[in-house]
A protein has these predicted regions:
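A short beta-strand structural signal in non-transmembrane regions
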Residues: 57, 143-144, 165-170, 191-217, ...
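Peri-transmembrane interface segments
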Residues: 46, 212-259, 268-273, 287, ...
């Protein structure tokens, strides 16, 4: 109890240094939670929106994957007619995926609205309605909120003006939809498609349909996957650079915590020469001195962790309110991981100053008094 009072008194006696240390550790925790949450948020949002399309099987041209082959229209849209004639197939919807880079990277879906809605049900319109003409477009509610657009406004997509005919609820693949025929014309790809979404009469027949498509002459090299298998590939281990990037973020954050605590505790030890000398002259052991300094470090770390978690949660709310398209996942597991990382980094930074304090000779420590 006496030691705890002394530790708290030391922190209160130097409020600015204590506050700076807490803020630095909070920065470390916030950095980890926001960046990791952003990475997982982008991945999981993409995964959820693909699941929301409602397809059971996804057919892509040869060499495609969930990361590649998503732009342009490399194959004939008539493949949809071939697949549609197969047993157990109820709906086939050809779609053009086109990457646009204006104002950020995004995917535009060129759709046949009737077959696309047959996959997972009609679009849920927040306002407006379906395409009324070839130059109409649908956007989801997140795009509408962030870009501050409404039904009837004109939006430029792929350097072409489109009238927004409807705003739909998010979660159905892309965030912008245009008529497939219009996108084919803009790309000079008449009668072409990028991907085929297939609906099956019974989930038990999904594997049979996958095998049937792969066995179709001329389609042996196509990528044919059940939606479940397709989505299961969207994991950190399958995303190039995902894990190394997270590792770098954690490493940089840990170094920040280590250096700040090292500097703060080392300086504090140098300033407490007299106090340490008195404690040792009264019989305090080396273990007692080390224990006191590590407890002080632990209190700073706990304060920084609590502040960092609170700041990250508030920042997440603020970011998603200001930029609805930015998704930041909140994970209790990563909160625990960030707390452990902060404590380990802070403790590592305090070990050398703590042992240096424990080695001080009481006579030398009091020599200038």
């Amino acid at each position: 109890m006496m030691m705890n009072k002394m530790v708290v008194a030391n922190l209160v006696h130097r409020p600015i240094r204590s506050l700076i240390s807490i803020v630095a550790i909070a920065l470390e925790v916030t950095l980890i939670l926001l960046i990791v949450g952003l990475c997982y948020g982008i991945m999981n949002d993409t995964k959820n929106r693909n699941a929301g399309i409602g397809a059971d099987v996804i057919v892509q041209p040869p060499g495609s994957s969930f990361l590649s082959g998503i732009s342009g229209a490399p194959v004939s849209a008539k493949i949809a007619d071939v697949i549609r004639k197969m047993p157990h197939v109820t709906v086939v919807s050809p779609v053009i995926w086109q990457i646009a880079t204006g104002g950020g990277i995004e995917v535009i879906d060129g759709i046949d609205i009737n077959t696309f809605q047959a996959l997972g049900g009609p679009f849920q319109y927040v306002s407006g309605g379906p395409f009324q003409g070839p130059d109409d477009a649908l956007v989801d509610d997140f795009i509408a909120r962030q870009r501050r657009v409404k039904v009837g406004d004109t939006m430029e997509i792929l350097n072409h003006p489109f009238r927004i005919s409807g705003i739909v609820e998010n979660g159905r693949g892309a965030r912008k939809f245009v008529p497939m025929s219009t996108l084919q014309e803009l790309l000079g790809a008449s009668g072409k498609a990028s991907i085929f979404y297939v609906k099956v009469d019974n989930p038990a027949n999904i594997d049979a349909v996958v095998s049937e498509v792969k066995a179709q002459p001329g389609m042996e090299r196509y990528s044919v996957l059940s939606t479940q298998a397709y989505l299961s590939m969207m994991t950190p281990s399958n995303l190039p650079g995902f894990r190394p990037f997270i590792g770098i973020v954690i490493g940089v954050s840990t170094i920040i915590g280590f250096l700040v605590i090292f500097q703060a505790i080392y300086t504090a030890v140098m300033e407490r020469t007299r106090e340490i000398g008195i404690l040792k002259s009264l019989g305090a052991s080396k273990v007692y001195i080390v224990n006191a300094i590590l407890r002080e470090t632990l209190l700073l770390a706990i304060g920084g962790i609590i502040l960092g978690i609170v700041v990250s949660l508030l920042a997440r709310i603020g970011i998603q309110h200001r930029w609805p398209l930015v998704h930041i996942d909140r994970s209790n597991g990563w909160m625990l991981a960030a707390a452990i990382i902060a404590i380990v980094g802070a403790t590592a930074g305090a070990i050398y100053p703590a042992f240096k304090a424990a080695q001080k000779d009481p006579i030398d420590a009091l020599a200038y008094e």
